[in-house]
């Protein structure tokens, strides 16, 4: 990791495969907290490249706990967070509205890293019990038109970095990654981002979805 950090500090970029390996190593506990915090800090000082984001995303998808809810044809309504405005959780509130209208929603989220109102914070306050049990998720979808996937239960890397992200308290590239790695891989997604330049990265999700449907 030391060599990788030196290269990044010199404004070099990671290749797709290298980025994938780094996320796999984070999940395996091969880096200490300071090294992971340094990696996060790099991407606060420059934009992440599409190749880097793609590699990170591929690693998370490869390590995820897969969930098949395709029979419900659900939509994912999600935001990156990190806009610094300390608003209420808009995407989660939107999920309640859409599910209440009878449309199936599969929400993938986490505790807030830069706020107190992450999706998991909101769901927990409403009495939702986080689970990976597919039967419970299906029953939730059938009864309420919504199923909630707490990200750390479905991906070891996201669990590994959660305390570091919370300690830093600043927006990171994981804000971009979270919405791109819903374990259900829903064909439909409404995605909110923290600033206009981030919109370009949503094309990654759109492209991958189209490729999966071909």
Predicted segment positions?
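Residue-level signal for inorganic ion chemistry
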Residues: 39, 123, 178
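Active-site-proximal loop->helix
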Residues: 112-128
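Glycine/serine-rich anion-binding loops at beta->alpha junctions
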Residues: 74-116, 175-176, 181
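Acidic, glycine/proline-rich low-complexity segments that act as flexible tails and inter-domain linkers
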Residues: 1-87, 101
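Conserved small/polar residues in nucleotide/adenosyl-binding loops
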Residues: 202-209
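Phosphate/diphosphate-binding glycine-rich loops and adjacent basic-rich segments that engage nucleotide
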Residues: 136-192
């Amino acid at each position: 990791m030391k060599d990788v950090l030196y290269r990044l500090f010199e404004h070099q970029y990671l290749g797709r495969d290298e980025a994938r390996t780094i996320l796999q190593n984070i999940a395996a506990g091969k880096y200490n907290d300071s090294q992971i915090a340094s990696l996060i800090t790099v991407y606060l000082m420059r934009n992440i490249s599409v190749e880097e984001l793609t590699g990170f995303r591929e690693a998370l998808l490869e390590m995820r706990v897969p969930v098949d809810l395709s029979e419900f044809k659900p939509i994912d309504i999600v935001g990156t967070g990190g806009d610094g405005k300390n608003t209420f959780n808009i995407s989660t509130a939107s999920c309640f509205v859409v599910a209440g209208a009878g449309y199936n929603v599969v929400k993938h989220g986490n505790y807030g890293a830069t706020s107190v109102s992450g999706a998991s914070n909101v769901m927990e306050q409403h009495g939702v019990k986080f689970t990976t049990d597919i039967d419970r998720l299906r029953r939730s979808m059938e009864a309420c038109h919504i199923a909630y996937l707490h990200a750390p239960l479905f991906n070891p890397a996201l669990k590994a970095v959660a305390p570091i992200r919370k300690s830093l308290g600043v927006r990171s590239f994981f804000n971009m990654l979270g919405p791109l790695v819903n374990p259900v891989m829903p064909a439909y997604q409404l995605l909110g981002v923290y600033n206009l330049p981030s919109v370009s990265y949503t094309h990654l999700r759109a492209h991958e979805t189209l490729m999966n449907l071909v």
